[in-house]
Amino acid sequence: MSKINLLLLCGGGSAEHDISLLSANYFETSLAKSEQVNVLRVVLDKFGQYQTAAGDDCELTNNREIRFRDETKAPWPVDYVIPCIHGYPGETGDIQSYFNLIQLPYFGCESEASSNCFNKITAKMWFSALGIPNTPYIFLNQYDDEAIAQTQAALENWGSIFVKAASQGSSVGCYKVDDSSKVAGVLKDAFGYAPYVIVEKTIKARELEVAVYEYQGEVVATLPGEIICDSNTFYTFDEKYAKSSKARTDVVAQNVPADISDQIRAYAIKAFKGMKLRHLSRIDFFLTQDNEILLNEINTFPGSTPISMFPKMLQNHGHDFTEYLSLVIKGQLAAK
């Protein structure tokens, strides 16, 4: 069998561009263990330009090939692509639509599932439709006096709130608000990141994560892992990725009753199947002191940085990441 020409596409136009590059390192290292693929790593910059790791300017054409600006270099045909892009245009579903248009097989969730999960408002509507408990919320579609009044009413009712840009990841455009005098400014900032904003009740709870992925025809949900932050903070962008972060992670959360763990995993699989996710996801939950389970969010292309939970949970579940990737890629190309 001839080797598969695999395009590892990373970067993108969001605030998570640099995190995407770190995740791509993990994919590149894992793929290097396989003798079945030729890997070409290409960075998509914030202006939509492509460049190889060697610094060659290039583009992905509608003929499913990488064409170089230096015309002395032969085009590189692409059999398969891994869009290792956090945020826009990867997790938003935009780039998947393009792959569908040019009939290029790709790793990860399809366009509609990606879009539905990335938009926090759409996602919560899906959670409720599937009968999966989630945090109380309101959503806003413009910054005006009415939006400020609605948010202040929510704060008065709930005591503490999170104001979030509806279409951002990694806690970008996310603010915890306890003081009504801060509402107007925070709303203005959030609307600077997205055209829609969601306001959620602050939940005092443990933050649990489940890796959910397809393996040999089955949907697998790992035991919940846990993000442990300082009690007075939340899991901000810096807490996730900065070297000075004080947050820590447990690949398997401690002191979670077996029946609660089973219910979390059941909800995770229900969300994965109900929202028609594909290949991989990380599904995040809150667990309150009263053992109430609330689905927080779904990440359709979870990070694979040195501190990321998804690859650790997959490995802890007994699966090798390189073998997992190979099974997905070969299965997808065989069904083409």
Swiss-Prot record:
TM spans (from-to): none
Entry superkingdom: Bacteria
UniProt-listed InterPro entries: ATP-grasp (IPR011761), ATP_grasp_subdomain_1 (IPR013815), D-Ala_lig_Van_CS (IPR000291), D_ala_D_ala (IPR005905), Dala_Dala_lig_C (IPR011095), Dala_Dala_lig_N (IPR011127), PreATP-grasp_dom_sf (IPR016185)
GO CC annotations, alphabetized: cytosol
Cofactors named for this entry: Mg(2+); Mn(2+)
Residues at which Mg(2+) 1 binds: 284, 297
Subcellular location: Cytoplasm
Reaction(s) catalysed (UniProt annotation): 2 D-alanine + ATP = D-alanyl-D-alanine + ADP + phosphate + H(+)
Binding site for Mg(2+) 2: 297, 299
GO molecular function list: ATP binding; D-alanine-D-alanine ligase activity; metal ion binding
EC number(s) per entry: 6.3.2.4
Record domain ATP-grasp: where: 124-330
Cofactor: how bound: Binds 2 magnesium or manganese ions per subunit.
SUPFAM superfamilies hit by this protein: Glutathione synthetase ATP-binding domain-like (SSF56059), PreATP-grasp domain (SSF52440)
Keyword set, alphabetical order: ATP-binding, Cell shape, Cell wall biogenesis/degradation, Cytoplasm, Ligase, Magnesium, Manganese, Metal-binding, Nucleotide-binding, Peptidoglycan synthesis
Annotated pathway: Cell wall biogenesis; peptidoglycan biosynthesis
Binding residue positions for ATP: 154-209
GO biological process, one term: peptidoglycan biosynthetic process
NCBIfam families reported in the protein's UniProt record: D_ala_D_alaTIGR, PRK01966.1-3, PRK01966.1-4
Role description: Cell wall formation.
PANTHER family given in the database record: D-ALANINE--D-ALANINE LIGASE (PTHR23132), D-ALANINE--D-ALANINE LIGASE A (PTHR23132:SF25)
Family according to the record: Belongs to the D-alanine--D-alanine ligase family.
Stated name of the protein: D-alanine--D-alanine ligase
Originating species: Shewanella sp. (strain MR-7)
High-level lineage: Bacteria, Pseudomonadati, Pseudomonadota, Gammaproteobacteria, Alteromonadales
Gene behind this protein: ddl
